[in-house]
Swiss-Prot record:
PANTHER family: 7-CYANO-7-DEAZAGUANINE SYNTHASE. Belongs to the QueC family. SUPFAM superfamilies: Adenine nucleotide alpha hydrolases-like (SSF52402). It comes from Shewanella halifaxensis (strain HAW-EB4). This is 7-cyano-7-deazaguanine synthase. HAMAP family: QueC. It catalyses: 7-carboxy-7-deazaguanine + NH4(+) + ATP = 7-cyano-7-deazaguanine + ADP + phosphate + H2O + H(+). The keyword Metal-binding applies.
Amino acid sequence: MSKAVVVFSGGQDSTTCLIQALQQFDEVHGITFDYGQRHREEIEIAKELATNLKLASHKVMDVTLLNELAISALTRDSIPVSNELMDNGLPNTFVPGRNILFLTLAGIYAYQLGADTVITGVCETDFSGYPDCRNDFVKAMQAALEQGMDKKLTIQTPLMWLDKAETWALADKFDSLELVRNETLTCYNGIKGDGCGTCPACLLRKRGLEEYLADKEAIQARLSAKCEN
């Protein structure tokens, strides 16, 4: 029996990955992390989606220690979300070590479940300037987890080379565009669906959707070409 663990925030990207995984694996388990995030409404959204999509299991893990260590606009309500980069060239929504921690814990959870695959929705094409969304980082994490647990483990990144328009096309491929558009939470200000429309996450999501809806056939063809390679 094939099993996978999906790092599941309840946002557009992880929900799209989850829907795809349900078509590819016998058992799909979700893991969601509560790190005291600004947009923690996403946790309740993830719970609702996990129930509605009938996951084999859904674990919400308390990792609020990360909030104490990582100062970011996503971990401090007192820091406004900015569309400008900081002096170090990173967005102020970057949470240092977040994906290191998430993938480590997801790998441990997969080990306990007997799953050989961890799936995450990180993307280098539209990676918002986050260094822990890059392919080289994911490869390094996979190698470290395999060495550290002496177990074959694959970290799949279905969206790694897709732009946001192609990610919408992928959701549509599985007849889930409206579900992803209306029932997920990507907004840094915690607003479901199309969100606030002004934060970096909403702007990226909106541009991708507009591009996809303007020329579905071309974007679907582009997605198919990438999936074949």
